[in-house]
C-alpha cells in the first residue's frame, strides 16, 4: 500500500485517489489543487469544468510570476488568474476516481469534501532543443504526483443560545464590571 501524506484521516469514512509521474505542469496543478482544497466534491467538479470552459479562473498565488490579470480572479481576492486546462482535466479525473472509490466503499457521495490534496514534483524529463551556432539547450518538462482524500462532511451542530451569550466578546472594562458585580452580589 502506498503511503499518503495525511495519515490522521479515518480510512473508513474516506476515499483516496492518486496519480504518479503525470505529464502536467507542477506549478499550474499546485495552484489548481489549492483552489479546490476543502470544497465539497460537487462544487470542486463544477469549478474544474468551468475552468475548462473559461467561466471561472484559478487564482495564481505562489507561482504567479508573469501571470496576466483576469477579472475572474476577484472572487478569490486576487488579480492574477489563469485557466490551466490540462491541470483541470487531470484533477477532474482523480476526483471522479476518488468518487468511484467512495461509492464502492458505500460512502454518501453527495456529502463528500476534499479533505486533503497535495501536489509533489516528480523527476524532471529531459529533452533538448537546438539553438543557433551549434548550441544545445535543455527542454525540460516538470511532471508531478497528485494525491487526494475525500471524506464525508461532519454534521454541523448549532451552539445553544446560552453558550453564544457566554462567548460574547467583552472588553477588559466590561469583564471587570461583571466581576465587581459578582463580588458585591455575593
From Swiss-Prot:
Query: What GO terms describe the biological role, i.e. biological process, of this protein?
Result: cytoplasmic translation
GO CC, sorted alphabetically, is: cytosolic large ribosomal subunit
What UniProt keywords apply to this chain's record, in alphabetical order? Cytoplasm, Ribonucleoprotein, Ribosomal protein
Where in the cell does this protein reside? Cytoplasm
The cross-references to Pfam families, in alphabetical order and at most eight, read:
Ribosomal_L22
Give the InterPro entries listed for this entry: Ribosomal_uL22, Ribosomal_uL22_CS, Ribosomal_uL22_euk/arc, Ribosomal_uL22_sf
* GO molecular function terms noted in the UniProt entry: structural constituent of ribosome
Keyword DNA repair carried by entry: no
Q: Which Gene3D superfamilies match?
A: Ribosomal protein L22/L17
**Family indicated by similarity:** Belongs to the universal ribosomal protein uL22 family.
Q: What does this protein do?
A: Component of the ribosome, a large ribonucleoprotein complex responsible for the synthesis of proteins in the cell. The small ribosomal subunit (SSU) binds messenger RNAs (mRNAs) and translates the encoded message by selecting cognate aminoacyl-transfer RNA (tRNA) molecules. The large subunit (LSU) contains the ribosomal catalytic site termed the peptidyl transferase center (PTC), which catalyzes the formation of peptide bonds, thereby polymerizing the amino acids delivered by tRNAs into a polypeptide chain.
Q: What is this protein called?
A: Large ribosomal subunit protein uL22
State the organism of origin.
Answer: Neurospora crassa (strain ATCC 24698 / 74-OR23-1A / CBS 708.71 / DSM 1257 / FGSC 987)
Gene it is expressed from: rpl-17
Amino acid at each position: 500500500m502506498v503511503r499518503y501524506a495525511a495519515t490522521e484521516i479515518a480510512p473508513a469514512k474516506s476515499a483516496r485517489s492518486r496519480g504518479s509521474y503525470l505529464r502536467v505542469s507542477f506549478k499550474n496543478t499546485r495552484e489548481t489543487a489549492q483552489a479546490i482544497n476543502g470544497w465539497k466534491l460537487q462544487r470542486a467538479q463544477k469549478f474544474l469544468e468551468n475552468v475548462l470552459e473559461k467561466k471561472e479562473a484559478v487564482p495564481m498565488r505562489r507561482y504567479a510570476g508573469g501571470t496576466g490579470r483576469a477579472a475572474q480572479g476577484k472572487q478569490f481576492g486576487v488579480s492574477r488568474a489563469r485557466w490551466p486546462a490540462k491541470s483541470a482535466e487531470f484533477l477532474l479525473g482523480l476526483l471522479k476516481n476518488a468518487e468511484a472509490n467512495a461509492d464502492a466503499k458505500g460512502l454518501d457521495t453527495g456529502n463528500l469534501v476534499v479533505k486533503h490534496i497535495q501536489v509533489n514534483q516528480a523527476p524532471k524529463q529531459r529533452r533538448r532543443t537546438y539553438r543557433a551556432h551549434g548550441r544545445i539547450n535543455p527542454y525540460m518538462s516538470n511532471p508531478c504526483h497528485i494525491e487526494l482524500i475525500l471524506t464525508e462532511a461532519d454534521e454541523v451542530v448549532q451552539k445553544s443560545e446560552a453558550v453564544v451569550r457566554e462567548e460574547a466578546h467583552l472588553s477588559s472594562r466590561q469583564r471587570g464590571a461583571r466581576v465587581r458585580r459578582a463580588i458585591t452580589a455575593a
